[in-house]
């Protein structure tokens, strides 16, 4: 039996316009069926976001996060 791997993560609205993956919306999350290249991109985004979160914990200054898929910039402040 073939199992399709799925990744559940928030997706940048700009990236959704360029994706060809089938997706289903659950609130702010999308479960997307990803091919190998998309998995690699998704992991890079997750790693970058985790690094940004860790950096933000150590700093009060404003950070700019950039979507690895489409390059959209997002301002994030430490709460």
Curated annotation (Swiss-Prot):
It comes from the Eukaryota. This is Putative uncharacterized protein EPCIP-AS1. It comes from Homo sapiens (Human). The lineage of its organism: Eukaryota, Metazoa, Chordata, Craniata, Vertebrata.
């Amino acid at each position: 039996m073939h199992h399709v791997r799925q990744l559940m993560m928030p997706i940048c609205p700009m990236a959704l316009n360029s994706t060809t993956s089938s997706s289903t919306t659950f609130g702010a999350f999308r479960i997307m069926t990803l091919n190998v290249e998309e998995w690699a991109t998704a992991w890079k985004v997750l790693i970058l976001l985790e690094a940004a979160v860790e950096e933000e914990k150590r700093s009060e200054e404003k950070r700019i996060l950039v979507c690895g898929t489409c390059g959209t910039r997002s301002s994030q402040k430490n709460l």
